[in-house]
Structure formats: C-alpha cells, structure tokens
C-alpha cells in the first residue's frame, strides 16, 4: 500500500497577480487534494525593482505588514538561541568535521535526535519537515566544493535551526495546514543563512515573497533554475529604503507619473538614449573587440553605446573596447601619421611617449592582499575599499567601487605572465599592489569615463629610444583594459614589449609594411592641429 505523503506544488500567479493568490485558501488553489495524503500549491517568488511610482510600492508593503496573516520576517527575525541548543548544534557540527562530512540522512538523524528540527502533530507534515531539511542540505552540499565541510555551513546550520525553532515551530502550532500555510515576506537584503532559511520555508510549503527595490536577485543563490518560485521584474529600480512603518501619504500627480514614465522609456538601460553619467553606479566590464587595422580607427571614434556588443542591465554595463598593438609603419606615411595624430588629439586621450610610465612598487603586499580576501579566496571589493592600502578614497563612490571590482576580477583571473618560479598567488599579489597604486594620469582617465559615452584612450608610442616598457606598465594596461578603456600601442621597429608580460590572446597585433628604426614622434603641424580641433568640436 502506498504511503500517504505531503506534496507541494509550485503556484504561478496569473498576469503577475500574486496578491490574489497569496490570500487564496489552499483548498481553492490548484493541485489541492486530500485523498492520498495532502497536496497543495505554495506561492514563492521575488518581486525585483519598483513601479514607476514608488509610493504605490511602499503602500503595498505597508498594507502587507498590517495584515495579521502575514509575517514581515525581515523586520521581526528572532536571532536568539538557547545555550543548550547552541551546544547541541556545535557538537553535531564537530562530529561532521571529524568524520569529514556526514551523509545528509545521518546529519538529519542527529538533529532529529537532539530535537533541533521543527515538529508537527500531523505525521505527514512532521515527516515532510525532515525531508525538506534533507533537500536543503543536499542543495548546500551540491553548490559548495567542500560540501557540508564548507566554512559557511556552520553559520547556515546554526541559523536555519534557530530560526526554525524560533519561528517555524510557533507558526505551525497555530496553523491548520489543510486550510492555510504561514505567509512570509522578506524585504531588502538577506544574508546567505537567511536565504537558506527562506528556501527551507518554501520547501516546507510556506508562502514566501521577497521584495528588493534595487532589483537584487537573491534567490539565484538557492533556486537558480526557479524550480520553486517566480521572479517578477518591475520597470524601475531604486535605492533600498527602510521598511515603511506607517502608510506613505504623498500622492503622485498625473503629470508627475507621466513625466516619470516618459523618463523611464527614454533612459532605461535598453533605450539607447542615455543621460550623462546615467551608469555612474554600475559595474563596468570590458568586452575587448577583435578588429582589423582599419576597423580599429572606426571603432575608437564611436561612443560606447554605438559599438557592437554594448549592453547594460540594472547593475553592470558591458563596454566594447580595443586593445591593439601596431607593429611597423605603413607605406602610406601620411595616412599612418594622420591616424595616429587623430587618436592623440582626442580630448579623452592620454599619450605616453616615455617609459616606464608607472612606478614599480617594491613593498611586500602579502599581508594587505590576504586581509582583502573573502572566504572563497577572492578579493572582496568592500574589504579592499575599507583597508589601509586603499588610496582612492577621494574619488566618487561609484568610481571607487568600479576600481575595486576591477581589481578583484583581474586578480581572480590573472592575465599577466608569471616570472620564473612564480606561483599564481604571486602574480595575483603583484597585480594587487600595482593596481592599488595607479598614477594620477591613469586615474584621470577613469574619472572622465562616462561608461555609455566617449571611451577614454591610452595611446603608447614606443620605440627603441624611448625607454623600456616594464612589468608594472603591463599591469596597468591590463587594469585599464579590464575596466573598458581603449589601448593602442605603436611600435615602429616591431619590437616585443608587452609580449614579455601579457598573454598574447588579450590583444590584437597589426603588422604594417615596414619596420622603421629610430623613428621620432612627428608632431602635427599647427594648421593640422587647428583644423582637427575645429572638426572635433
């Protein structure tokens, strides 16, 4: 005979009407059945961003908060834990470490034996609570390289257990699970362990809704394929505000709403009509284009949003840029110098004709590097910006964040060639110390960078007479390329310079007709300079 079970189904709101479904009793929802156990639909998901009129958004949140059937868990979370409970959890965790990872079933058996799992008088729900916890543990183990021995697991274990005892137990005691399950709302940011508890509530069958006005997709951590819940993206985003303690009473006029709607249509990320500095708080990520020699000059004169592969979303902006080296001089000498002078004369161009153009940092940065790492061994941008080594505090907040995230990315995937007997970590530390000490002229390029608009350029004219390009120069070039700046290196004699330090697949090389030695830089004539200045305005 088949054992009776409790089965949870995913409820999907029709046309985004999650509110009607939220307050619908279980027997009126799809998949409700009591013939062979209990079967019902659970509403779970996240509402990202805000409507055009934020007042409506916060009114809706306030209305949810005053409804007795709903718990705003983000505002009422009980983080206390009894000493005895803590000791029991600590003991089970130590057993797990000694045995180098208990099986999920044994782990749940230990927790059940110590009465550390929520319980219920209905045997179907009682058994389901344990199955749901096993699913949670499997999910954690499968998404972490060290499984249940991962450093984050202890915190997740403690929090899921104490939150279950502090909240889920009392909720279930007063709930008729054949009529209604607990309804939970979370507003704003959640920690990793809090997200796993919300995930557990979904698995158990509670209705769970997450709201984030800034549009942060938090459920991707625990439900990346949206197997449990839905995601609704509202048309706008806004900064995270405190949860409304009273009903907002400011009403938008029709004209105000119309203005906001028009502004959204014109200036949202995919409109191709961008306000100045619209993306100043976005994370810039370069998409380095592979071009021909002729295409190089067509691309560099275009603004970023006109270039192929430009893309912007709520948080990041992908900037098509170029990283190219031009070897030799073309037979058409006039065209060669005209193109070079055009690049050099752009207002957003920094020209380098003397090398090295950066300073080699000799200090040992291993301590600073290790203290900027997160638990995964990658640079944490927030830790970096709060550290003593951070020298960019005078820059706008968005620029600081962009620099820190760029340093983190380039150290995670270093493209600088290792010296003899250097390990990957040595290269990462070298990149870290060089990019935390960038010269003022390069910082200026970054500060003037309005990501969707004109792309700043670094043009290097390097001959055998102008000094040697160093490893510290190469580190700076990799950083500027990573953040989205155009880099063009002229080398008339066709000598190797960046090839000694940077992996060859990171840039294009264009070979011209003749290798020319001891070729001084030719300044444009006064007439040409004046004409070019007029035509660029």
UniProtKB/Swiss-Prot annotation:
Top-level division of the source organism's lineage: Bacteria
InterPro entries hit by this protein: YceG_bac
UniProt-recorded name of the protein: Uncharacterized protein YceG
Highest classification ranks of the organism: Bacteria, Bacillati, Bacillota, Bacilli, Bacillales
Gene (UniProt): yceG
């Amino acid at each position: 005979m088949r054992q009776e079970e409790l089965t949870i189904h995913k409820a999907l709101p029709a046309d985004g009407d999650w509110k009607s479904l939220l307050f619908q009793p279980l027997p009126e929802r799809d998949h409700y059945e009591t013939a062979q156990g209990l079967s019902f639909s659970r509403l779970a998901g996240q509402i990202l961003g805000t409507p055009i009129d934020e007042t409506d958004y916060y009114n809706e949140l306030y209305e949810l908060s005053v409804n007795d059937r709903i718990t705003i868990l983000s505002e009422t979370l009980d983080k206390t834990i009894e000493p005895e409970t803590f000791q029991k959890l600590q003991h089970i965790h130590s057993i797990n470490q000694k045995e180098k990872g208990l099986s999920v079933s044994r782990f749940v058996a230990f927790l059940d034996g110590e009465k550390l799992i929520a319980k219920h008088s209905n045997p179907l729900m009682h058994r389901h609570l344990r199955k749901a916890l096993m699913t949670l543990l499997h999910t954690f183990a499968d998404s972490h390289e060290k499984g249940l021995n991962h450093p984050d697991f202890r915190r997740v274990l403690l929090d899921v257990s104490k939150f279950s005892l502090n909240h889920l137990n009392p909720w279930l005691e007063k709930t008729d699970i054949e009529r209604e399950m607990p309804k939970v709302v979370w507003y704003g940011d959640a920690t990793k362990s809090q997200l796993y508890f919300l995930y557990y509530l979904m698995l158990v069958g509670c209705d769970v809704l997450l709201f984030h006005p800034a549009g942060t997709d938090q459920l991707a951590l625990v439900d990346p394929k949206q197997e449990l819940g839905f995601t609704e993206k509202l048309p706008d985003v806004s900064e995270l505000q405190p949860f409304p303690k009273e009903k907002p009473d400011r009403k938008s006029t029709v004209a105000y709403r119309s203005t906001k709607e028009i502004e959204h249509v014109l200036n949202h990320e995919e409109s191709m009509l961008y306000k100045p500095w619209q993306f100043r708080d976005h994370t810039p990520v370069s998409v380095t284009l592979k071009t021909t020699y002729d295409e190089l000059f067509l691309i560099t004169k275009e603004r970023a949003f006109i270039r192929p592969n430009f893309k912007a979303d709520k948080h990041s902006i992908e900037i098509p840029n170029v990283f190219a080296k031009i070897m030799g001089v073309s037979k058409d000498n006039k065209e060669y110098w005209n193109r070079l002078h055009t690049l050099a004369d752009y207002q957003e161009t920094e020209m380098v004709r003397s090398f090295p153009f950066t300073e080699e940092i000799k200090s040992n940065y291993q301590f600073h590097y290790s203290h900027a790492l997160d638990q995964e061994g990658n640079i944490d941008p927030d830790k970096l910006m709060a550290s003593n080594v951070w020298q960019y505090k005078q820059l706008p907040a968005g620029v600081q964040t962009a620099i820190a995230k760029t340093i983190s990315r380039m150290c995670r995937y270093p493209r600088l060639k290792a010296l003899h007997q250097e390990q990957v970590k040595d290269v990462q530390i070298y990149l870290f110390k060089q990019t935390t000490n960038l010269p003022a002229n390069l910082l200026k390029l970054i500060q003037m960078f309005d990501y969707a608009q004109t792309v700043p350029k670094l043009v290097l004219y390097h001959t055998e007479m102008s000094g040697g390009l160093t490893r510290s120069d190469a580190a700076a070039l990799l950083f500027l390329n990573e953040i989205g700046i155009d880099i063009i290196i002229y080398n008339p004699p066709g000598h190797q310079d960046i090839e000694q330090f940077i992996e060859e697949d990171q840039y294009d090389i264009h070979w011209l007709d003749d290798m020319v030695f001891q070729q001084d830089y030719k300044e444009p004539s006064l007439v040409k300079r004046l004409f070019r200045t007029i035509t660029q305005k």
